[in-house]
């Protein structure tokens, strides 16, 4: 089945968290843990070599600068002001330069994070409701929870405590962004 699995008498679905927000809030994790249903949250965190992270960010800045030049050329050909570039391009360029500065001067390190959410329920309907509830929690914190279509088995294997991540949908975070996550016992 495309977006769920069945194991014994339980139905399950694994989703990944697409982190759109610039930082990850530990309050979101607490909200997931406070949910009154069968939910398992998995964080796979991989450290990146410091020099490699700097090289990667420099390449990204070069790519963004190249895209900016192409946009400026298009604007000139179309008779527009060349200083007007798409806002996303300007935003990403600024963020990449800030990230490079942080890596070079603030002793920040770079990490890759995969955050998976496993929902379990007794019926398909209850599973769908619980996945919907988990997606609402993610949305509250400017994140998107997306089911792993056709990759439920890999998601399940990545959710059991073997330390193996078979889902390589990752988001780069710095030390300070990652340190905002305080794993603790949920409050009841």
Over which residues does each language-model region extend?
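Extended, folded cores of ATP/NTP-driven motor/assembly subunits in large transport
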Residues: 1-180
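Residue-level detector of conserved catalytic or cofactor/ligand-binding positions
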Residues: 179-187
